[in-house]
Amino acid sequence: MKKLLLLSAIGMLLSAQTVTREQVDAWMTEISNWGRWGKDDQRGTLNLITPEKRKQALHLVKEGVSVSLAHTLEKEKFPDNPRPLGQQMTLDAGGHAMDLYTIWYHGSTITHIDALCHYSFEGKLYNGFIKSEKISESGCAALGVENQKDGIMTRAVLVDLPLLKNVPYLEPGTPVYPADVEAWEKYAHVKIGSGDALFLRTGRWARRAKLGPWNVAASAAGWHASMMPWFKKRDIALLGNDGVQDVQPSGIDKAPRPIHQLAIVALGLPLIDVMDLEAVAAECAKRHRWEFLVTLAAVPVPGGTGFPVNPIATF
């Protein structure tokens, strides 16, 4: 009898964590933020970072210690870096050095923020903008990265699941569920709330340092699609992790990146992909404090789908 009850409980748990393509499509409407900040809004959940929220975040600075959350750009080609940084130097007779960069930042080795025009669904962008009317070869006529030019400053919470699970890193393909994040809240004595930035450390860079590069775009630990209603309920303003956000493979037929689709298009939630959270994880563990002030800004490229960023944590 006990065995049957256990099997039943396991079955219910697995069922609760199974998300279908139909559910993802339904969430596009059910958890949508379209119209929440007006029909012309182009900032999405960044609206949740109010002046009061910024002032509260400043109180988290106690020591003035700052840590970068960005991965240093790489010039070598690897399985997770098929399009490495290009740098062309120019030296003139006057002794000045200049360079031209070629950066394919929408990948899995360059820390970058996604603008809200980066993803679409059924011909529409966040807040109902029509893709065919707003996106062309010359850029995004709405929802471009220039809408973030005033910068982002808020409270950030680091979720360090390898620490919670007492492992050096999560294996590729490991999904992260709401129960994992809530277990972390209890462990770290934090409560994730409105206007917060939420950063997930999977230990991707620790695994890479030990075992070498692999194709993170095809196989990575990350958020499970079932996190999306949770993100909406908690009113997360900014989402990031050290991989490509979505667990890969997603496990959902015809929905390879449900986190990207739902976060960007339905919620208007900007994403920071490919963060390097190793140093900040060490600083947090040293202090037994997993909340801090985070600041960042993207270069306001008109109509840009995103830009490389260097988020800074300050304790």
Predicted regions and their residues:
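Sec-dependent N-terminal signal peptides
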Residues: 3-12
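Basic side chains
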Residues: 2-3, 201
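Active-/binding-site microenvironments in catalytic and ligand-binding cores
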Residues: 17-315
